[in-house]
Swiss-Prot record:
Organism: Equine herpesvirus 1 (strain Ab4p) (EHV-1)
Topological domains, Virion surface: 31-431
Gene: gC
PROSITE patterns linked: IG_LIKE (PS50835)
Descriptive protein name: Envelope glycoprotein C
Region (Disordered): 31-73
Length: 468
């Protein structure tokens, strides 16, 4: 009887132990799940990139290489460079793989471009630049052209493609090299543009490329000249915008007082470009006089210079024209002097200069103010005298009113006088001859009268003595 009871005891004990084990395992699992959150699992995709010949490499999103994978890239320190005109620029570009001549070919190109991709913000410039090259693509460097270099330190230059090869310092040819720096010695209109580093596989397939955009600028110099004018003539001024870059980067406007001047009616423009590529623009305004204006207006030249598409600077200069009354000048000969009379001249700042046969004489003149100009307030009349030349012959005596600003016509007058003795004695001789002829004529008249009177008396018979 004891054997069946033993079997029952063992079975019950087994069940109790099994239940305890399951309960413990369940509690441990629940405790673990509460104290440590489960970490979600992400699947990292593989990104396929451009490869060299015979490469099946891939790079995942975390930047780590998968088995048998490698990304081939070209990296430059800067992608946009903007510097002042004539400044040097260093561009440092590297490849992620060594450029072995048997596997790769690296080339550097220059795409000559203007800085404005769309419509230029400035005015159109009417000039012809015979020295400029059109927008084109130039090959500067190629690892496949190692034997065409002609100058030490200038390796890789493709001959006859650039006007001056010394514009650049090019990379050295190194088997398996990864560094391909390029230096522009002086940035100007020839060297501004987009520089492209391109890596090709042996079969000519483009592996990768990158670009660096280089732009340059030069701020303009603004000069305004307000021209003097005579009363009743147009107001004139000239604005010179010199040595600026880029092309079509200046917007110019004229203002009379605060009102903008009609560009098509009253403004003329001319532009020129120098061999260095800098532009100079000359703008001239000529505005008719408004008789209703009481005062002379102010003329202002204002420019907006765009260094690039997003930034600009405004520069302006203004001035008021000086208006003068044209004087009346006349020269005459009086009492052995040449006399110059100038009417309606400024009371200060002007004077008379003489010339004899276009030469300045050494004889001083005597200048004096003779009164005020009745038709123009603030102006005076003046007179200058100088002795006539004692030399024989014909002389031109010119009187010039000096002191007026440049831009006005010359105010002068000229008289011709001959001081030869024959010419000087001719009036006396003429007088003597006239008196003599007059006296002779008078004597002849008296004689004729006497003869006539004598002949008109009646004749009488002779008397005889016996008649007495």
């Amino acid at each position: 009887m004891w054997l069946p009871n033993l079997v029952r005891f063992v079975a019950v004990a087994y069940l109790i132990c099994a239940g305890a084990i399951l309960t413990y395992a369940s509690g441990a699992s629940a405790s673990s799940s509460q104290s440590t959150p489960a970490t979600p699992t992400h699947t990292t995709p593989n990104l396929t990139t451009a490869h060299g010949a015979g490469s099946d490499n891939t790079t995942n999103a975390n930047g780590t290489e998968s088995t048998h994978s490698h990304e081939t890239t070209i990296t430059c320190t800067k992608s946009l460079i903007s510097v002042p005109y004539y400044k040097s620029v260093d561009m440092n570009c590297t490849t992620s793989v060594g450029v072995n001549y048997s596997e790769y070919r690296l080339e550097i190109y220059l795409n000559q471009r203007t800085p404005f991709s769309g419509t230029p913000p400035g005015d159109e410039e009417n000039y012809i630049n015979h020295n400029a090259t059109k927008d084109q693509t130039l090959l500067l460097f190629s690892t496949a052209e190692r034997k065409k270099s002609r100058r030490g330190g200038q390796l890789g230059v493709i001959p006859d493609r650039l006007p001056k090869r010394q514009l650049f310092n090019l990379p050295l040819h190194t088997e398996g090299g990864t560094k391909f720096p390029l230096t522009i010695k002086s940035v100007d209109w020839r060297t501004a543009g987009i520089y492209v580093w391109s890596l090709y596989a042996k079969n000519g397939t483009l592996v990768n490329s990158t670009s660096v955009t280089v732009s340059t600028y030069n701020a303009p110099l603004l000069d305004l000249s307000v021209h003097p004018s005579l009363k009743g003539e147009n107001y004139r001024a000239t604005c010179v915008v010199a040595s600026y870059f880029p092309h079509s980067s200046v917007k110019l406007r004229w203002y009379k007082n605060a009102r903008e001047v009609d560009f098509t009616k009253y403004v003329t423009n001319a532009s020129s470009v120098w061999v260095d590529g800098l532009i100079t623009r000359i703008s001239t305004v000529s505005i008719p006089v408004d008789p209703e204006e009481e005062y002379t207006p102010s003329l202002r030249c204002s420019i907006d210079w765009y260094r690039d598409e997003v930034s600009f600077a405004r520069i302006a200069k203004a001035g008021t024209p000086s208006v003068f009354v044209a004087p009346t000048v006349s020269v005459s000969v009086e009492d052995g002097d040449a006399v110059c009379t100038a009417k309606c001249v400024p009371s200060t700042g002007v004077f008379v200069s003489w010339s004899v046969n276009d030469h300045l004489p050494g004889v001083p003149s005597q200048d004096m103010t003779t009164g005020v100009c009745p038709s123009h307030s603030g102006l005076v009349n003046m007179q200058s005298r100088r002795p006539l030349s004692e030399e024989n012959g014909e002389r031109e005596y010119s009187c010039i009113i000096e002191g007026y600003p440049d831009g006005l016509p010359m105010f002068s007058d000229t008289v011709v006088y001959d001081a030869s003795p024959i010419v000087e004695d001719r009036p006396v001789l003429t007088s003597i001859i006239a008196v003599t002829c007059g006296a002779a004529a008078l004597a002849l008249v008296v004689l004729i009268t006497a003869v006539c009177f004598y002949c008109s008396k009646p004749s009488q018979a002779p008397y005889k003595k016996s008649d007495f």
